[in-house]
Amino acid sequence: MDQNMTLEKRIAAELYSYQGRMSVFVDDLRDSTVEIGADEEFETASTIKAFILAVLYLQVSRGRADLEEEITYEASQFVDGSGMLRALGVGAKLKVKDTATMMIICSDNIATNMIIDYLGLDTINACIRELGFGHTVLHNPLHFDRYDKLGTTTPRDYAALFAQVAKGTLVSKEASAAMLGIFRQQHYNTMLTHDFPQFYLDCEETGEPELIWVASKSGSMNACRNDGGIIHTPYGEYVIVLMNKEFHDIIEYNDHPAMVYGARVSRMILDQILACEGKLYLK
């Protein structure tokens, strides 16, 4: 029996009634992947911030950026949406590292514009290509009243970023570890974890060892609902990316169909990984 097709068919069956289009990429970081629409292009929404973080650490490694340098929130960088910097006001000064951390963990849009200005949009795109993500582009800073598109990527590119973080090969071992620590603090992972057994995730309440943790970055705009990252299990890590488009409901809420069906697929993959002791398939 073709086990790969069996798993893909199970995912397809789960998505049969979904009124949208979902692409899936899963890598067990051993020798197997699941790929459904892996090379389709998607609006990135805030998932582009993961690529920007990688570029920042690349530039730090070259001495062209400094995590301890202070940068200033300027009026031109204001944008609505997620984040905390709106509460601080124009003129606030933050270290580059703290700004980048806010860009990821609470998906701060103003912090993102600050880092884009710090690095330069053209430099960001050149470095994204240099890092090997050939189908990923940052089109514009975050200004929703001026631009319809933020970025473009594919599930394969996004999965490759997290696979390199997990393996310690994105920029360097030290940079990968630093980025992993930031991704682990990211607040918004409902699509990946909503259907996980909460016992696995809540070691602070249960007092048990942390069995499962997530290092991820999600992104949502009218045109997309995306999530992707590293899932740690007792058997090791795997990478999962779920990207959604062509749905009808543009309102953002946790029970959005893309979130509901994404969570079902994510749980299906988790169960498969646990049943196969860290692999996608028993061979």
Positions of the model-derived regions?
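Structured C-terminal helix/loop/strand segments within mature extracytoplasmic catalytic/sensor domains
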Residues: M1-E14, Y18, T33, T169-T190, ...
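Short glycine/serine- and small hydrophobic-enriched flexible loop segments
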Residues: A54-R62, D117, A160-K167, R267-L274
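Short, glycine/proline-biased beta-turn/loop segments that scaffold the active-site neighborhood
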Residues: R62-L88
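Active-site SXXK
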Residues: E43-I71, I240
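Conserved catalytic neighborhood of penicillin-recognizing serine enzymes
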Residues: F78-N113, G151
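A short glycine/serine-rich beta->alpha loop
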Residues: I36-E43, G89, A100, Y147-D148, ...
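Mid-domain, small-residue-enriched loop/turn segments at the edges of structured enzyme/sensor domains
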Residues: R21, M114-L170
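Short, conserved catalytic-motif segment at the N-terminal edge
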Residues: Q19-E41
